[in-house]
């Protein structure tokens, strides 16, 4: 029975050891393991959320970039249209100014031509009168002289 008493004593000691471990050692170990599992699960969930947030941020950045490019294209097209409009307005204005200057120059030329004709008529009239005076001085034949004067006046 010695052998049985030893086995029985060892079994009782083992049962007490297991009970002690289950009562005092096992709960803190399980709590530490559960805490660690929770931390790992939270870390994985956080990493997954960060990955999803990164994907959303990439998609948002891509959309914003597309919108910015579209807006830039619209602005460039508007600027090109405005440039063409300004060029057309400048060409039209320059053409109008050119037409105005040409018309003004032609008017000045015509006025100068009229003034020169008038001056020439005055000089011709003075010469005609001087010629008539000389003709009258040389001859007193009025019929011939009046015929000459009439021809001069008709030419003027």
Swiss-Prot record:
GO molecular function, one term: proton-transporting ATPase activity, rotational mechanism
Any matching Pfam family: ATP-synt_B
Keyword Cell inner membrane appears in the UniProt entry: yes
Cysteines paired by S-S bonds: none
GO terms under cellular component: plasma membrane; proton-transporting ATP synthase complex
Functional summary from the UniProt entry: F(1)F(0) ATP synthase produces ATP from ADP in the presence of a proton or sodium gradient. F-type ATPases consist of two structural domains, F(1) containing the extramembraneous catalytic core and F(0) containing the membrane proton channel, linked together by a central stalk and a peripheral stalk. During catalysis, ATP synthesis in the catalytic domain of F(1) is coupled via a rotary mechanism of the central stalk subunits to proton translocation.
Cross-referenced PANTHER family: ATP SYNTHASE SUBUNIT B, ATP SYNTHASE SUBUNIT B', CHLOROPLASTIC
NCBIfam families referenced in this protein's UniProt entry, alphabetically: ATP_synt_b (TIGR01144), PRK05759.1-2 (NF004411), PRK05759.1-4 (NF004413)
Protein name: ATP synthase subunit b
Origin species: Salmonella arizonae (strain ATCC BAA-731 / CDC346-86 / RSK2980)
